[in-house]
Amino acid sequence: MAPRKDCVSSRSELVNGGILVKLEVLADADAVARRAAAMIATAARDAVADRGRFVLAVSGGHTPWLMLRALADLDVPWAQVHLVQVDERVAPPGHPDRNLTHLQESLLDRVPLPPEQIYPMPVEASDLDAAAARYAVTLRAIAGAPLVLDLVHLGLGPDGHTASLVPGDPALEVTAADVALAGPYQGRRRMTLTYPPLNRSRRILWVVTGGEKVDMLRRLLAGDESIPAGNVRHDHAEVLADRAAAAQLSAGQMRGA
């Protein structure tokens, strides 16, 4: 089979601590979105065949929506999929700042996912700390205790944040809870999964696009623990990046250890 024209290279990376990360660089954000969607669809079918369900955790930000639109067009066993949020902004229902608003438009309105298998973060609650604790209980009810998610999609911010684990926030230090409240960031408080459930998940899928991510992608692949994303330490992590984000990777990083 001839190689895909939109795939620039596919390599394996060894990051600090000997953790293997698979890196795939594609032509542009559209190609990354299609590839990510295909990987999620395959993971869903495999999980349902093996375990009878697939628990997918989706991050917010600006990068997921192309991926989720592509996913809506693929063969996915939606009746056995459970969808949870990695993070959410504290904002009113339907507000454009809410990740759920975009999740609804890009995916949920377009697929037959049972409503009772969609688990929005409860950011409208009056007591957000109690709501975060309840959300963690809900997740453990569908994905076990300790919580093990099947696939977690993560993005990467230009400041090195991932999920809503942002530089300097106390949520970075939370290890005794699976869900935490983060302080105001870009004008909004956030609810977020913490490092323990991210690192316990069966699989991590990083989706990184755009030239503003070049330095942070290099640092992520180098295992730089001074950035929040660098503390996601997972033996089954895959990074999909476009050419713009990968523009400053060294020959060694592209070649692998």
Named regions from a protein language model:
Residues 49-72:
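Glycine-rich N-terminal segment of FAD-binding domains in flavoprotein oxidoreductases
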Residues 79-153:
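Ligand-binding beta-strand-loop-alpha-helix segment within the catalytic cores
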Residues 58-63, 154-158, 209:
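Glycine-rich beta-strand-to-loop/alpha-helix junction loops that act as flexible
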Residues 70-78, 101, 105, 167-175:
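A glycine- and small-aliphatic-rich helix-loop capping segment at beta-alpha/alpha-beta transitions
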Residues 151-196:
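Class I SAM-dependent methyltransferase SAM-binding "motif I" and its flanking Rossmann-like core
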Residues 198-257:
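C-terminal functional extensions of proteins
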Residues 13-56:
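N-terminal glycine-/serine-/threonine-rich phosphate-binding loop
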